[in-house]
Amino acid sequence: MKVEVCSFSGSKVYPGAGRLFVRGDNKVFRFVNKKSESLFLQRKNPRRLSWTVLYRRMHKKGISEEHAKKRTRRTVKHQRGIVGANLDVIKEKRNQRPEVRAAARAAALKQRKDKKAASESEKKAIKAKSAASSARGQAIKNAKAAARH
């Protein structure tokens, strides 16, 4: 037994029941009753008539308890190592006491300051040396110029 579906209302049309409508372009429409056929021919929208299956499907009527709620994925945080520090090193630093961490920070800061001061003094020495040589060159030029006059 082949059960058809109404082209308008979406309800089942059993063999020997319902009406058949063939349009000019040979498209076949099956209707469960005269009411569905009449509304189809009046070009009514089945989604706006509350008794049709299409309306019920569109407005989520009757089948809501059948579907389980859609689950959303939860984000899970993971601890991972980064370049230059693996996970063990990171955990070790995190578990250090604040005083130890502050002392290490102060030592690193002092080391950086010392290094910067050393490089600056080196630059000053180079600058003084170049200034002295240029001053000597200038003095020689001045002496030659005085000798000419």
Curated annotation (Swiss-Prot):
- What SUPFAM superfamilies would the database entry show? Glucocorticoid receptor-like (DNA-binding domain)
The principal location of this protein is cytoplasm
UniProt entry tagged with the keyword Ribonucleoprotein: yes
Q: A GO term (biological process) for this protein?
A: cytoplasmic translation
Keywords carried by this UniProt record: Cytoplasm, Ribonucleoprotein, Ribosomal protein
Q: Which GO terms describe its molecular function?
A: mRNA binding; structural constituent of ribosome
Q: Which Gene Ontology cellular component terms are annotated?
A: cytosolic large ribosomal subunit
Q: Where in the cell is it found?
A: Cytoplasm
**Which residue stretches does the UniProt record annotate as biased composition, category Basic and acidic residues?**
93-102, 116-125
Q: Which Pfam families match?
A: Ribosomal_L24e
**Entry superkingdom:** Eukaryota
Give me the ranges of the annotated region Disordered: 93-149
Per UniProt, subunit arrangement is:
Component of the large ribosomal subunit (LSU). Mature yeast ribosomes consist of a small (40S) and a large (60S) subunit. The 40S small subunit contains 1 molecule of ribosomal RNA (18S rRNA) and at least 33 different proteins. The large 60S subunit contains 3 rRNA molecules (25S, 5.8S and 5S rRNA) and at least 46 different proteins.
Task: Give additional notes from the record.
Answer: There are 2 genes for eL24 in S.pombe.
Family listed: Belongs to the eukaryotic ribosomal protein eL24 family.
Name the job this protein performs. Component of the ribosome, a large ribonucleoprotein complex responsible for the synthesis of proteins in the cell. The small ribosomal subunit (SSU) binds messenger RNAs (mRNAs) and translates the encoded message by selecting cognate aminoacyl-transfer RNA (tRNA) molecules. The large subunit (LSU) contains the ribosomal catalytic site termed the peptidyl transferase center (PTC), which catalyzes the formation of peptide bonds, thereby polymerizing the amino acids delivered by tRNAs into a polypeptide chain.
Identify this protein by name: Large ribosomal subunit protein eL24A
**What's the source species for this entry?**
Schizosaccharomyces pombe (strain 972 / ATCC 24843) (Fission yeast)
Traced from the root, the source organism's taxonomic lineage reads: Eukaryota, Fungi, Dikarya, Ascomycota, Taphrinomycotina
